[in-house]
Amino acid sequence: MRMNKILLVFVFLSIATVINSGTTSNFVRTAQPSTEMSLETFPSPAGHNAPEQVHIVQGDYNGRGIIISWVTPLNLAGSNVVTYWKAVDGDVKPKKKRGHASTSSYRFYDYTSGFLHHATIKGLEYDTKYIYEVGTDGSVRQFSFTSPPKVGPDVPYTFGIIGDLGQTLASNETLYHYMSNPKGQAVLFPGDLSYADDHPNHDQRKWDSWGRFVEPCAAYQTFIYAAGNHEIDFVPNIGEPHAFKPYIHRYHNAYKASKSISPLWYSIRRASAHIIVLSSYSAYGKYTPQYVWLEQELKKVNREETPWLIVMVHSPWYNSNNYHYMEGESMRAMFESWFVNSKVDLVLSGHVHSYERSERVSNIKYNITNGLSYPVKDPSAPIYITIGDGGNIEGIANSFTDPQPSYSAYREASFGHAVLEIYNRTHAYYTWHRNQDNEPVAADSIMLHNRYFFPVEELESGNTRA
């Protein structure tokens, strides 16, 4: 009898390691793909050779530079010039400066792009609003941005987080829900932008329409991009053997500032965050360029200056959805111990078209003899966020594994976006907002504790609207 009781306790404990107290939301959204917006939904702006698809990214390592990008139909004199100045009050005459962009175009199958202009502006003042203009004669268009505050450990800053956006009616809802939040200052975007490759011959016009679609946000706020599988555009059967060609031509970044040799992996420092961007679809095995770069970059992180260490990589390492299940496993096995040793705070991914937040877990103790092959709680591990739920044409990934595994804290098969409000070196507030009834409902939230300065276990503070 005593032996039976012992066996019963053992079985119960074994089950407890697999079945989680996490939440699988019962909110139901149709699995049908959202309607894609047509090419005509976002027409080119009026005016001769008017600039379009305007967007900005950080142009250096620490936030005193910006890359302003735009597209024009023709490469006319002056079309590569950007004029910019500090916003001033009253009758003060602004001191205007000019920058000159590099200009290129590309061909893809039967498509020829417009002229792609990328102007790098350096020496900006921190935490300052700038006005900028692109275009010539009667086609000048004006925008603005605010440079980030100077890097420091207690600098508050708010990031939006959007992934796998595409250009459907649901995508539009996601983007404008984020834009309605006055706190958002920059966007972390872990891949899959236009979904042009879901159309015949990777219809490059969808890259143009996507650029026009996101311009109302991307021309005013810095986007930090990771490349996803829908950016690969590798189609040798139609004469396109060069991976990432449209993405690299259209979306420049300051990768050289972080000593990277590729725009597909790089890092920046912004306010109190050190952000590392990795490429799921570039070689990352031992001694490859990405491996060597990441090893060196993690050594450079100074948590006394940038306490919040955030990584973006498109394919998730912890995912309990049957869609793309364990696709990120080889990269996890390669780098997870580095992330734990470096006390990474957050890892942001897309790829899976639903939402999930993990517990702080790791699976780094496994070897072929000890059988420790399941993730366990680890206070030094990051929280993994899967946010491939922007609204793209492929629809919702609504097939979660059952039972919910112990590493999964909250999961929901619906569209939305997230917001990360960094308060200081110890605390940041994270919320995920589902698209529901035309409102960005806050469905999941948690107060994050910094792994370097305050490595205390977080208490669940959300999941009240499941």
UniProtKB/Swiss-Prot annotation:
Q: In which tissues is it expressed?
A: Specifically expressed in flowers.
Q: According to the lineage, what is the superkingdom?
A: Eukaryota
Localization in the cell: Secreted
Q: Name one Pfam family in it.
A: Pur_ac_phosph_N
Q: List, alphabetically, the InterPro entries matched.
A: Calcineurin-like_PHP_ApaH, Metallo-depent_PP-like, MPP_PAP, PPA-like, Purple_acid_Pase-like_N, Purple_acid_Pase_N, Purple_acid_PPase_C_dom
What Enzyme Commission number(s) appear in the record? 3.1.3.2
Q: Which residue positions does the secretion signal occupy?
A: 1-21
Identify the keywords attached in UniProt to this record, alphabetized: Glycoprotein, Hydrolase, Iron, Metal-binding, Secreted, Signal, Zinc
Q: Which residues cross the membrane?
A: none
Q: How is the cofactor bound?
A: Binds 1 Fe cation per subunit. Binds 1 zinc ion per subunit.
Q: Where is the active site?
A: H324 (proton donor)
A GO biological process of this protein is: phosphate-containing compound metabolic process
Q: Which cofactor does it need?
A: Fe cation; Zn(2+)
What GO MF terms are annotated? Answer: acid phosphatase activity; metal ion binding; phosphoprotein phosphatase activity
Q: Which residues are listed for substrate binding in this entry? A: N229, H351, V352, H353
Ranges in a coiled coil: none
Q: Which residues are glycosylated?
A: N172, N367, N424
> Binding positions for Zn(2+)?
D192, N229, H314, H351
GO terms for cellular component: extracellular region
Binding-site list for Fe cation? D164, D192, Y195, H353
Please list the reactions this protein catalyses. Answer: a phosphate monoester + H2O = an alcohol + phosphate
- Entry-linked PANTHER family: ACID PHOSPHATASE RELATED (PTHR22953), PURPLE ACID PHOSPHATASE 25-RELATED (PTHR22953:SF114)
Q: Which family does it belong to?
A: Belongs to the metallophosphoesterase superfamily. Purple acid phosphatase family.
Assembly, in brief, is: Homodimer.
Its protein name is Purple acid phosphatase 25
